A protein has these predicted regions:
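C-terminal subregions of glycosyltransferases and related glycan-biosynthesis enzymes
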Residues: 198-338
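Conserved nucleotide-sugar donor-binding catalytic segment
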Residues: 77, 116, 134-242
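N-proximal low-complexity "stem/linker" segments adjacent to membrane-targeting elements
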Residues: 1-25
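Short aromatic/hydrophobic "clamp" motif used to bind/position activated sugar donors
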Residues: 84
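A conserved acidic beta->alpha catalytic loop
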Residues: 38-47, 64, 88
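Acidic helix N-cap motif at the loop->helix transition within catalytic regions
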Residues: 15-18, 43-51, 92, 96
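Conserved donor NDP-sugar-binding/catalytic core segment of glycosyltransferases
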Residues: 96-128
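Glycine-rich, basic loop-to-helix element that forms the pyrophosphate-binding segment
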Residues: 62-79, 100
Length: 338
């Protein structure tokens, strides 16, 4: 029996799945099987998969479509290896993906999930890195999913009963890793391990509004773990105005800053989050929203420097006062990358 199962759920990815499978078959780490779990595709996905003759491939084809989350659970139920590596049928893995993630899990028994960086390609292009240390990952999970295409211990499924939740779709990954955080640690390698294809038909593009609602639910779940004492009003504020990408007024900024202080204070009584990591991530959130606000307000239309200064000092700067704008403009621009 191999040590690793690469779990690849598929549904109507015929144009991309061959390239995805071939990238798995090129892995330098060889002690693996590739389990393709097809969720009743209506295109040629299965035909493409079956045309690839390789002993590493195992196919589980289902006639009933159950959706991504439950399809992942069907796949997990078929796995009996030590590790599971998760990959979609339209992405491309680097040849050292499994090698590097398995090495981390082998050498650090306290770590249950190893993930890494990735590159978006297609309709959107960018490099993405998540926090490396577990403490920073936890704090970042209050805002966004910090795990993608990971290798994880099958014991999370066997011993802790963790499953992908169908009611969390299309943010099922975020919810799954948020639940895993309660029983294990995460480590993120700081290098590109795979390439994440962006295209109009993928779930995160086609169902953007629904995904945003489900992401808000996971953020609420994370907040409730930080402290069970938040009121419903505070939870709604956290998933709503606090997470808004831009700041509406000086009062809005002050309210956000005050709420950050409450988060730190509440965490002290429970202690689930490292305080330094939490403070750093909250400060980053304030800086990024300030930066986004300033860019949207003053630079989006390509103002010249004289026009920008006239606008800034003319008192039109969001009714917050010029000293506020200048101070945080400089702070945001200087610290955005940290």
């Amino acid at each position: 029996m191999p040590r690793v199962t690469v779990l690849m759920p598929t549904y109507n990815v015929a144009p991309y799945v061959k390239e995805a499978i071939e990238s798995v078959l090129r892995q330098r780490y060889r002690d693996f099987e590739l389990l393709v779990v097809d969720d009743a595709s209506t295109d040629d996905t299965l035909a493409v998969v079956r045309s690839i003759d390789d002993p590493h491939i195992r196919i589980a084809a289902f006639d009933n479509n159950v959706g991504l989350a439950e399809n992942l659970n069907r796949g997990l139920a078929l796995i009996d290896t030590e590790y599971v590596a998760r990959m979609d049928g339209d992405d491309i893995a680097e040849p050292f993906w499994l090698e590097k993630e398995v090495a981390v899990l082998d050498s650090h028994p306290e770590i249950g999930i190893c993930s890494g960086g990735f590159e978006r390609f297609g309709t959107v292009q960018s490099l993405v890195r998540f926090p490396e240390r577990h403490e920073d990952c936890m704090a970042n999970m209050l805002f966004e999913c910090s795990v993608i295409v990971p290798t994880f211990r099958m014991s999370l499924y066997r011993d802790h009963g963790l499953r992908y939740r169908t009611d969390a779709f299309p943010a099922e990954d975020y919810r799954f890793w948020a639940e895993c955080l309660r029983v294990t640690k995460i480590y993120n390698l700081q290098e590109t391990l795979f390439h994440y294809r962006m295209h109009p038909t993928q779930i995160c593009t086609a169902r953007r509004k629904e995904q945003q609602r489900k992401v808000a639910e996971v953020r609420r779940y994370m907040l409730e773990w930080l402290s069970p004492d938040f009121t419903e009003e505070e939870k709604s504020y956290y998933t709503g105005q606090f997470m808004a990408p831009q700041i509406a007024s000086r009062q809005d900024y002050n309210e956000r800053k005050s709420f950050c202080g409450r988060l730190v204070a509440k965490n002290r009584s429970v202690g689930h989050f490292d305080e330094a990591a939490l403070r750093h991530r909250l400060d980053k959130h304030l800086r990024l929203t300030l930066y986004s606000t300033i860019v949207e307000r003053y630079f989006k239309e390509g103002y010249s420097i004289p026009k920008y200064l006239h606008y800034l000092f003319g008192g039109l700067a969001l009714k917050t006062g010029w000293h506020y704008e200048i101070r945080f403009l400089l702070k945001s621009l200087l610290l955005k990358g940290n």
